[in-house]
UniProtKB/Swiss-Prot annotation:
Propeptide: 94-99
Cross-link (Glycyl lysine isopeptide (Gly-Lys) (interchain with K-? in acceptor proteins)): G93
Gene Ontology BP terms: protein K69-linked ufmylation
Protein name: Ubiquitin-fold modifier 1
Matching CDD domains: Ubl_UFM1
Gene Ontology CC: cytoplasm; nucleus
Pfam families, A to Z: Ufm1
Known role: Ubiquitin-like modifier protein which binds to a number of as yet unidentified target proteins.
Keywords on record: Isopeptide bond, Ubl conjugation pathway
Record carries keyword Disulfide bond: no
Family statement: Belongs to the UFM1 family.
Amino acid sequence: MSQQTTPAPGVTKVTFKVTLTSDPKLPFRVFSVPEEAPFTAVLKFAAEEFKVPAQTSAIITNDGVGINPQQTAGNVFLKHGSELRLIPRDRVGGSSLAR
């Protein structure tokens, strides 16, 4: 079970609601992270919460726009808002090579 820690004074946090799109029940998690946290850490944390591999996952907006993880969580929040979707990359486009 994870522990909640009290943020240092002056640390601004942003809150995201991340939905797992590969599950028909569309489960979601809500969590807050420091504004300056790298978004790659947010992606990794969200993937771990849903027990999917972070290396083969991506986060997109509700409109289907991909998010570049090489920015801060605060930047993503300002550009795309708080509602995001986690999608395992094996579910994105592509074609099967098996015949």
